[in-house]
Amino acid sequence: MGKHLHDHPDVVQVLDAPELKDLFGLSLSGMAQTLRGIVEWRKHRTGMLTTNFAEAGGFIKSDPSEPAPDLQLHFVIGKLVDHGRKTVFGHGYSAHVCLLQPKSRGAVTLTSRDPMALPLVDPNFLADPDDMARMVRGFKRTREILMQPALAKFGAKELAASASARTDAEIEQFIRQYADTIYHPVGTCRMGPGPLDVVDAELRVHGLAGLRVVDASIMPRIVSGNTNAPTVMIAEKAVDLLRAAP
């Protein structure tokens, strides 16, 4: 239990686009626009605040020889730095690339006998060289997309942190510094019949009576996409299992 932790490692390129004031941004005009948006949403449930912020995305191959897409892209209508924890003024947009089937595995371990103590979470991102190689290719593919005429016409400029990464070695250094979770952790209570597996096919913990695990941690391997819908499915299946239990 607690082993086999994995997630979709994600890295973002943030672009400054001062002229795109219809996007979310910290500025006088942006604040006024947001206030108008709040009023519109409260009155009509329409307008800019109905956005999910990640308004576009897609699945691509890091290399044409891949049998299936191994990268997922998210396009955000604002300058999102450090999950929004860092204040960035002005208007712009962000492009995320995340690895769908990472080989690296981390772990969650206890730090004490106190059940209220926070555990130690080691995501161990990019420990496998193949993960980094795919992320570097994905970073470069994302930059190519951002340079296409449909976006280039807005004159956006990458923020310095990523703009200075030009060679593969520099891109790798940028990724190691800035790659982070996209909130899709799975695997620490994985399903299976083996000695290192935690639950069986009915979500029951091996060796313990009356205990089941019902969340994304039971996934033996992460899905190639967002984990929300599969986790809902796991919960719905658990309901059926509990109703059928004697």
Predicted features along the sequence, with ranges:
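Mid-to-C-terminal "cap/lid" subdomains and adjacent gly/pro-rich loops that border
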Residues: 1-89, 144-149, 169, 173-177, ...
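C-terminal structured subdomain/cap of oxidoreductase catalytic cores
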Residues: 1-20, 63, 93-151, 172-246
